[in-house]
């Protein structure tokens, strides 16, 4: 999969969600918009914020469009004007979360070891948002099912983040910052799998799991520089 690199926003956007609706990304990444477009983007972001709160508190299945609509002073029809279905709204919430992670990583998106450091920072941040972590864990597992409405979203997401992570290891190798003999593709797959697995374990035992610490302990032996 090719990753767009036309400008800073493109490079940041492509990190996790290559097909994210543009208006949500403009708000999530801090890009400037004007006029009616800005008003529409702001309203959509308000809906996404409300949905994130509802879904992370009571779960996606129990969370209703009515509750989301009430939080932003709209009718259900008003919400559906911006998002055609509950599934579309969920995708926007997940994409917005990825946008926040991208901002933590840096703009423009860092390369090499700096990218890996950004993933550790993202893990630290995730420990402050248990509801959103739980939402991601549950929906990403459900999204592996054939025919699930978000299967395509997660397929694209994992392809994008895996590609960037592999490129980070490859760049580190070019700079002599990666231990010789390290398989960059395997290291990237293992790192992403570790991040996902740690989120599940952390949800079950948050007082016993240090997600960022465990990521550092995995990465440091692979590097010739301090993480």
Predicted regions located by residue number:
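Hydrophobic alpha-helical connector segments
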Residues: 92, 103-134, 184-191
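N-terminal intrinsically disordered/low-complexity leader segments
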Residues: 1-42
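Hydrophobic alpha-helical bundle segments that form small-molecule/ligand-binding pockets
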Residues: 14, 23-24, 147-148, 159-187, ...
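Hydrophobic alpha-helical segments that form the core
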Residues: 135-137, 182-201, 214-221
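Helix-turn-helix
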Residues: 42-46, 50-92
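Amphipathic alpha-helical packing segments from all-alpha helical-bundle domains
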Residues: 102, 114, 129-131, 148-175, ...
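Helix-loop "lid/cap" segments that line or gate small-molecule binding pockets
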Residues: 121-127, 135-145, 217-222
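Short, basic, alpha-helical segments at the C-terminal edge of helix-turn-helix-like DNA-binding modules
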Residues: 95-101
């Amino acid at each position: 999969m090719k990753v767009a690199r036309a400008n800073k926003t493109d490079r940041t956007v492509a990190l996790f969600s290559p097909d994210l609706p543009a208006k949500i990304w403009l708000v999530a990444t801090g890009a400037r918009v004007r006029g009616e477009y800005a008003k529409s983007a702001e309203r959509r972001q308000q809906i996404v914020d409300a949905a994130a709160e509802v879904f992370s508190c009571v779960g996606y299945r129990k969370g209703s469009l009515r509750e989301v609509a009430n939080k932003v002073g709209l009718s259900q029809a008003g919400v559906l004007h911006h998002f055609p279905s509950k599934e579309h709204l969920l995708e926007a919430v997940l994409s917005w979360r990825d946008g926040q992670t991208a901002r933590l990583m840096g703009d423009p998106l860092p390369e090499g070891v700096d990218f890996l450091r950004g993933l550790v920072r993202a893990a630290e941040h995730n420990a402050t948002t248990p509801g959103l972590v739980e939402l991601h864990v549950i929906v990403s597992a459900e999204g592996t099912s054939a025919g699930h409405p978000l299967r395509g979203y997660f397929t694209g997401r994992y392809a994008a983040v895996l590609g960037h992570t592999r490129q980070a290891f490859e760049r580190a190798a070019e700079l002599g910052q990666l231990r010789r003999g390290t398989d960059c593709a395997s290291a990237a797959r293992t790192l992403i799998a570790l991040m996902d697995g740690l989120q599940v374990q952390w949800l079950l035992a948050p007082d016993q799991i240090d997600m960022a610490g465990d990521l550092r302990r995995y990465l440091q032996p692979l590097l010739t520089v301090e993480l």
